[in-house]
Amino acid sequence: MYKGFGDDKSQLKCSFCGKLQDQVKKLVAGPGVYICDECIELCNEIIEEELQDENTFDLGDVPKPKEIREILDQYVIGQEQAKKALSVAVYNHYKRINLGSKIDDIELQKSNIIMLGPTGSGKTLLAQTLARILNVPFAIADATSLTEAGYVGEDVENILLKLIQAADYDVEKAEKGIVYIDEIDKIARKSENPSITRDVSGEGVQQALLKILEGTVASVPPQGGRKHPHQEFIQLDTTNILFICGGAFDGIEKLIMNRIGKKTMGFNADIKGKQEKKIGETLREILPVDLLKFGLIPEFVGRLPVIVTLDALDEDALVRILTEPKNALVKQYQKFFELDQVQLEFTDDALRAIAQEAIKRNTGARGLRAILEEVMLDVMYDIPSRNDVTKCAVTKEVILKQKEPVLVTSDRKKKKEESA
């Protein structure tokens, strides 16, 4: 309570509601104005309501499929068919949320997504970018760390906890988020026939995931870990959460080729020609039956109706990934050097050598940064301590570790820094 603004306390009153000082708990003074605690509380409520309205997800805010695709193009190189399929699936998912799952007595079912593609082809990046475009909470989980309840490992509810944490514990916001479950192929059944022994990290996890994929009110332990009776739970409805499952599914192309071969043999088709297709082209012919043969259970496949396939990235695509996206690695390194007033350049041969090394290591786009870190470590260690370097050129020989980067020096820069 503020005093000293006048001898007559009754003259002090709230400039907003007009209540006198002795009618309220607190009266805060500003230059020539006063506000009481009740008006402050009311203002906070109004601001909170407006913020909630801003955060409310509205169909008008959801970009159209073409717009989603255009934004994906800024971050993800290649994978044109995958970007198209994901744009449509995501748009339809959030349209379903906003219009209600039942329209004119027709129930609109949830369309979770399964992505198949080699390591480093962009599965995780696509899922992350979609969440960024839609401004919804996003969580990544690794299927290999999951086990069914009662066994050592993570419960499937821990996936939902990551989403709640990404939403700053705003449950309503989390219920419209996106969850990406990586390495989903690693929880495939070990054999096509059901086993007598318990498969706690394979079929058991698939069974545990069924409910949250379809839509249920899950009890999520707020501190993570295993459930125990005396713990309070967060209730999270998964009906409107979009689940994207991704995996490399190594060897599934053979199952597809076997199916295609059997199907076309009676028509004297050129089976050999089909078998010579690239793996990426073969994957595009995938059907749910191939996922079943790989080891996913029918109920699990049924809850992932949208199948998206990605191609292995070739040398040209990897070079484009290095230079074209908004957050391209070359642009990032150039910015690091720019902060030390050094211009960084990569020759075309150097970029191709980096791409070739990533292909050799079979790491796809994911391995590009590791290669660059290895090559650039020494020069990034030395340059900040030198005040005469103005330019650094990286050639093919540098990538092949045959030469050091070419450094251009200038006495003018050295003198300028010394005088500063």
Curated annotation (Swiss-Prot):
Residues 2-55 form the ClpX-type ZB domain. GO terms for molecular function: ATP binding; ATP hydrolysis activity; ATP-dependent protein folding chaperone; protein dimerization activity; unfolded protein binding; zinc ion binding. GO terms for biological process: cell division; proteolysis involved in protein catabolic process. One of its GO terms (cellular component) is HslUV protease complex. The keyword rRNA-binding does not apply. It holds the Pfam family zf-C4_ClpX. Zn(2+) binds at residues 14, 17, 36, 39. PROSITE patterns: CLPX_ZB. ATP binds at residues 118-125. Keywords: ATP-binding, Chaperone, Metal-binding, Nucleotide-binding, Zinc. CDD domains: RecA-like_ClpX (cd19497). InterPro entries: AAA+_ATPase, ATP-dep_Clp_protease_ClpX, ATPase_AAA_core, Clp_ATPase_C, Clp_protease_ATP-bd_su_ClpX, ClpX_bact, P-loop_NTPase, Znf_CppX_C4. SUPFAM superfamilies: Glucocorticoid receptor-like (DNA-binding domain) (SSF57716), P-loop containing nucleoside triphosphate hydrolases (SSF52540). Belongs to the ClpX chaperone family. HAMAP family: ClpX (MF_00175). Component of the ClpX-ClpP complex. Forms a hexameric ring that, in the presence of ATP, binds to fourteen ClpP subunits assembled into a disk-like structure with a central cavity, resembling the structure of eukaryotic proteasomes. ATP-dependent specificity component of the Clp protease. It directs the protease to specific substrates. Can perform chaperone functions in the absence of ClpP. This is ATP-dependent Clp protease ATP-binding subunit ClpX.
